[in-house]
C-alpha cells in the first residue's frame, strides 16, 4: 500500500523532514516514489516551516495513497494556510 509519510533528514539536533510517497513496507528513510514537500519543525525567522506540492498530493491521494497521522495534520495545516 502506498503511504505519504515523513522521511528524516537534517543533522544532529536539527531535524528536517521530507514528505515522501513510498510503499508502506519500505524503511522510513528508504527508497520512495516521489518527494512532495518538506517540513522544518524548528524553522526560525524567515525560514519556511512547511512546503507541500498540493497538486501532487491530490494526485497520490486519488490513486489510493494513505497519509500518516502526522502528515494528515500537516496537510490540513497547509490547506488552511493556502486558503
UniProtKB/Swiss-Prot annotation:
Origin superkingdom: Bacteria
Protein name, as recorded: Small ribosomal subunit protein bS16
Family recorded in the similarity comment: Belongs to the bacterial ribosomal protein bS16 family.
One of the Pfam families matching this protein, by short name: Ribosomal_S16
GO CC annotation: cytoplasm; small ribosomal subunit
Alphabetically ordered keywords of this record: Ribonucleoprotein, Ribosomal protein
GO molecular function: structural constituent of ribosome
GO biological process: translation
